[in-house]
Amino acid sequence: MKAKKYYGQNFISDLNLINKIVDVLDQNKDQLIIEIGPGKGALTKELVKRFDKVVVIEIDQDMVEILKTKFNHSNLEIIQADVLEIDLKQLISKYDYKNISIISNTPYYITSEILFKTLQISDLLTKAVFMLQKEVALRICSNKNENNYNNLSIACQFYSQRNFEFVVNKKMFYPIPKVDSAIISLTFNNIYKKQINDDKKFIEFVRTLFNNKRKTILNNLNNIIQNKNKALEYLKMLNISSNLRPEQLDIDEYIKLFNLIYISNF
């Protein structure tokens, strides 16, 4: 069956690559694995061997029929749905597992949506493993003063330890995409989250500050609080130069700035 462009389908079949990807997951058998976009089940075949429960979410009816024909495993559940429309928290609540991980050969066109949907339930997850466009993977794992650094980098760092695992050459897929991919892993923790009383508000705060990367942090902050003098005072209190641009601040500085503005009585 041919891949469907409108679903962003690109398939893998190399067994060494499949094993290498699945190896990135924590190899604790007693866990729930949620696979997003299993396609023809290349990863699924290995997942059902290694883990107690695997739930796959696939939007394409044709792929679902292939999966149902290929697999007859008691530890596999196949759900036909658009993952962006599923309540993942409610889905997870159906299963009694302490260790829950997500794995996905992510369609390029909904990468950000899937990432942010995953981050929203990070407190329920142990780990996530994503195959992404290489450029996006580098962006997620970048740090301040690096070209790719943006609000997505900070959002992923806020919820997890980010790891750039390895590059996947585009020739490993069929049909062959235009660019290489890469595997990243997010190991979830509360190191930064416990410093903030409203994580969603913080993520939106950072996103707004990155709306115009060419502007200084002072001008972008002024767009939020609508008071340039007050914005300058906040930056001075934290010893942050008003001439810096958003990509020149690290996550600790963003957290301090957020808390100063929204928690303190200053």
Curated annotation (Swiss-Prot):
Name of the top EC class for this enzyme: transferase
Positions contributing to S-adenosyl-L-methionine binding: 10, 12, 37, 58, 82, 105
Keyword Methyltransferase: yes
Keywords for the protein's UniProt record, in alphabetical order: Cytoplasm, Methyltransferase, RNA-binding, rRNA processing, S-adenosyl-L-methionine, Transferase
Superkingdom field: Bacteria
Molecular functions (GO terms): 16S rRNA (adenine(1518)-N(6)/adenine(1519)-N(6))-dimethyltransferase activity; RNA binding
Reactions catalysed: adenosine(1518)/adenosine(1519) in 16S rRNA + 4 S-adenosyl-L-methionine = N(6)-dimethyladenosine(1518)/N(6)-dimethyladenosine(1519) in 16S rRNA + 4 S-adenosyl-L-homocysteine + 4 H(+)
Any one annotated GO CC term: cytosol
Protein EC: 2.1.1.182
CDD domains linked to this entry: AdoMet_MTases (cd02440)
Pfam families reported for this sequence: RrnaAD
Localization, UniProt: Cytoplasm
Family to which the UniProt record says this protein belongs: Belongs to the class I-like SAM-binding methyltransferase superfamily. rRNA adenine N(6)-methyltransferase family. RsmA subfamily.
Known role: Specifically dimethylates two adjacent adenosines (A1518 and A1519) in the loop of a conserved hairpin near the 3'-end of 16S rRNA in the 30S particle. May play a critical role in biogenesis of 30S subunits.
Name of this chain's protein: Ribosomal RNA small subunit methyltransferase A
